[in-house]
Curated annotation (Swiss-Prot):
Main location: mitochondrion
Species: Dictyostelium citrinum
HAMAP family: Ribosomal_uL11 (MF_00736)
Protein name: Large ribosomal subunit protein uL11m
Family stated for the protein in its record: Belongs to the universal ribosomal protein uL11 family.
Signal peptide residue numbers: none
Cellular localisation: Mitochondrion
Length: 148
């Protein structure tokens, strides 16, 4: 499941007019893209405007995800150095690791115990994220009936 914003959809039309130079698959933390290695040099070798990419990516992902959540990104670059990117839905295992990061670090023996109420609330959050990732459903009642 991929997500592309209206701004990126408009850029997609322009990028697809020319031949595609490269398609990059990246793993970037939401809202934390910067010029530091390995991302900065990776983008620099293709000659795109890195600052524009970082600003676009950080502003779009801050609204949708918690800061630092690992996101799979597909970056398309054409021969004129124009680009657009698509966000892929994070894996559910990554979402659960983000929610229970403190419990996993504090666990002894590899077993993690979570309260039932908290687990249900977090499953509800994940269900909402999955439903609204492509902005298909936003009604709480529909999500409540469908997932819980």
């Amino acid at each position: 499941m991929t997500y592309i914003s209206k701004k990126q959809a408009m850029k997609k039309v322009l990028v697809r007019e020319k031949p595609i130079l490269v398609r990059l698959k990246l793993l970037i933390g939401a809202g934390t893209a910067s010029m530091t290695p390995p991302l900065g040099p990776n983008l620099g070798q293709y000659g795109i405007n890195s600052i524009e990419f970082f600003n676009d990516f950080n502003t779009e992902t801050k609204e949708l995800f918690e800061t630092g959540m690992a996101l799979r990104v597909i970056l398309w670059i054409n021969v004129m150095k124009a680009f657009y990117f698509e966000l892929q839905m994070p894996k559910i295992s990554n979402l659960l690791k983000e929610y229970y990061k403190n419990e996993v670090e504090a666990a002894k023996g590899g077993n993690v115990y979570i309260e039932k109420d908290r687990l249900l609330k977090d499953c509800f959050k994940i269900a909402i994220l999955i439903c609204t990732f492509n902005k298909e459903e936003k009604q709480w009642e529909t999500i409540d009936k469908k997932y819980l």
